[in-house]
Amino acid sequence: MEQVYNKLVRDKIPEIIESNNEIPITRILNDKEYKEELEKKLYEEYQEVIGANGMDRIEELADMLEVMKALASLENKTLDDVIKVAREKEIKRGAFNKRIYLKKVLKK
């Protein structure tokens, strides 16, 4: 039986498939395709995060983080670089801890 995926997978997935006595049919993406597939994967992981809770949500957040690492590497940056920028933004603009919901802004 054949199952079609047509999506970016983690590096060890072909080995895991082979260990299950199945044959993965793969190809290596070019730079443009890789970027596009990472963007699709980020959206896919986002949707999974929204639909999960508890430890499942943590697992999905970890998947999302892995995609973010790969996207950062396309910009010749690391996850540490992303975290540094996030900290700088937190210092300047704050975090989301206070649960502030901005309804509107009135002119004085």
What kind of feature is each model-predicted range?
Residues 1-108:
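Flexible "arm" and connector segments at domain edges
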